[in-house]
């Protein structure tokens, strides 16, 4: 591949730029909530996996437990999640999103929708659905590439 045309021919390059643009957009929109890009993914995961454990979160995001503990502590400090002692294991905690966290998740959903709607304007409904379908295929290739 010719590096002069990388920005036009490389899907990897395009995805990196898309990610950068989305990250900057989210940073701006989420600044009032003191949420970084990394933090809102944790909040979304905990919301989808009510009563998950710190180990579950570490496994999902492929990070060490110390990193997860720091991240969860920050979300708890800001009032977005709460740690509840696991009734089956007094040494473990279950994680839940608080009412404040639910409100922020609603705002995050709106932020995502606004971004999506901006992109949708460039495509017909059929083209947009096809784009999303194809991007899911690309996303799922990750596992196959890691196994090579």
From Swiss-Prot:
SMART domains: HTH_MARR (SM00347). One of its GO terms (molecular function) is DNA binding. Residues 54-77 bind DNA. InterPro entries: BilQ, HTH_MarR-typ, WH-like_DNA-bd_sf, WH_DNA-bd_sf. Gene3D superfamilies: Winged helix-like DNA-binding domain superfamily/Winged helix DNA-binding domain. Transmembrane segments: none annotated. SUPFAM superfamilies: Winged helix' DNA-binding domain (SSF46785). It comes from the Bacteria. Keywords: DNA-binding, Transcription, Transcription regulation. The keyword Transcription applies. The keyword Ribonucleoprotein does not apply. Residues 1-140 form the HTH marR-type domain. Transcription regulator that regulates expression of the bilirubin reductase operon (bilQ, bilR and bilS). This is HTH-type transcriptional regulator BilQ. It comes from Clostridioides difficile (strain CD3). The lineage of its organism: Bacteria, Bacillati, Bacillota, Clostridia, Peptostreptococcales.
